[in-house]
Amino acid sequence: MIALLQRVTRASVVVNDVTIGAIGAGLMVLLCAERGDTPKEADALLGKLLAYRVFADDAGKMNRSVTDVAGGVLLVPQFTLAADTCSGTRPSFTPAAAPELARSLFDYFVAQAVQRHVQVATGEFGADMQVSLTNDGPVTFWLQVKPAI
């Protein structure tokens, strides 16, 4: 499972001209399930994401997590993160989980995030979304938990 996280001062997602999710300062997270992923990978990735230290402490070092700063988390499904771009000029999405599994894992991830973190907003699986954000830094990290085979 993959999470591309960006530290933001604000972020929102719009579907059909309606804002369906928005946060202030926190993390905007593009989330992708890969073939072979299970709730085990989702749990591991969520734990890492909520504890990942990307916010500055009093000394200016990245030493605080989104949990520590009580920041928002905007979770946006994006299967294109699993693209295989190694050959040719057209990406292959073979590494991505099948849509049914991906939706199930996204929903599971969101449910677990809501249980573990106060401020959670989401995009809509399968929708054409417009995502807006103001990067803070910019600070961007790729987190990935590979399925145990």
From Swiss-Prot:
KW Cytoplasm (keyword) present: yes
GO cellular component term, pick one: cytoplasm
Entry keyword set: Cytoplasm, Hydrolase, RNA-binding, tRNA-binding
Superkingdom to which the source organism belongs: Bacteria
Record-level GO BP terms: D-amino acid catabolic process
Compartments, record wording: Cytoplasm
Domain free text: A Gly-cisPro motif from one monomer fits into the active site of the other monomer to allow specific chiral rejection of L-amino acids.
Protein name per Swiss-Prot or TrEMBL: D-aminoacyl-tRNA deacylase
Organism listed in the record: Herminiimonas arsenicoxydans
Gene of this entry: dtd
